[in-house]
Amino acid sequence: MNAQRGRQDLGRCTRRALAPPRLAAALLTAALAASLTACSGGGSVNIANSQLSDPTTVDFPIFYVKRQVPLNSNGTVAQDDLRVLRDAVPSADLYKRATASPSATETNITARLTAGARWDVKDVDTSPDGTRVVFAMRGPLAVNQDPKQPPSWRIYEYVIASDTLHAVINPASDPDPLTVNDVSPHYLPDGRIVFSTTRQSKSQGILLDEGKPQFSAMDETRQEPAFVLEVMNADGTFGADPLHPQLSFNQSHDRDATVLANGRVLWSRWDHAPGKDAMSLYSANPDGTDLELYYGANSHMTGSNSTVVEFVQPRQMQDGRILALERQYTDVDDGGQLVIIDGAHYVENTQPLAANSTLTGPAQTPATPNDVLTIPGPSPGGRFSSAYPLQDGTNRILVSWTQCRLLDTTQTPPAIVPCTSTALRAPNPRPRRRSTACGCSIRSRTPSCRSCSRSRA
């Protein structure tokens, strides 16, 4: 155990990285999970808050992903799976609004590339100085695209001042532009980008040094190559040593990297081995040293009715706590509950760090009072799909949220009805999804998103 932190030390100990000065961002980003972002009849999504604006608060542009809700061949909603990172859902684009207001003009940033073709977009992040936006794109995709075949996921960057869009890694100089997949980019304070990738640069270099054939390690399910964390320069190069950038080593996926105020990288790791199958939070220095479990290895039985949940999409809030999404792997309509984790004092929900041994927990609390269920079926409080803490001193969170609705199949044609207690007691209530994107105040756990404008799916 790490004596200072009371965490499990999983790597070579080094001097902890100091937090570089982080510039105030002039741009805030919301990555709206596409499957939960409802489109209106006109194809638009409302991002708004009906509360009066605070004259002391500066409003910033927002970027978000918008796509159609994916359907199976039988017309039912297709369920995502946290363990599958390579699959794509066509019909997505990256959009910009000058403010989080229904009157703000919506601009399609990626239309210059997608041009109506079948592309997918995800994992949006902004640079610390608020001048650039980075995200993952895949396309153009065939109607019955084999996820194992190219085109693959690539990382793109949008420069706001010049209104230019480009692939961060130049395909012409990429040694393997067709089969490797790069997702989940996040800016480091020095301008470099940490991302999840199937490149496995150092792993394959070790195989080469040992005289063994180079191959991409598959995850334990053998469904797709393992995604691990690597770091590249701002221009998409990897420096003189092409094997240096690999930050993490895992037999399954490392995803959703972000940077803490102390300069360390925090991410969600899929630990999958005999007798173990969970996604917990890990951290390390930006060079991969001093790897440690950050939170949650023994806190997965904290879902609805003490069911299993995974911890994904961690982001640090201005007060130092961690905002994360807890949800099951699949069959939960692409969403779950937002929780706030006190990672500064706890390593598990009821286990404090060594320096805080008198604390009893809980370490994690719901971000809102919504009655959100993390099990399959209707959720009275709706479900959250993604969240972005606004670093503007207002303690707000921009979220992608789907309201609880039911499909009454006793009517002809079937009708959408509210999730009332009576309707929920009906035999086999069927959820119908509706999404809202809005800013929520968590000062007193009273979500302002209840008054947001909503768009029907």
Task: Locate each region found by the language model.
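Multi-bladed beta-propeller domains
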Residues: V45-N46, S101-W119, V159-T179, M232-S252, ...
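Asp-box/WD-like beta-propeller blade repeats and closely related beta-sheet repeat scaffolds
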Residues: Q149-V231, G239-R255
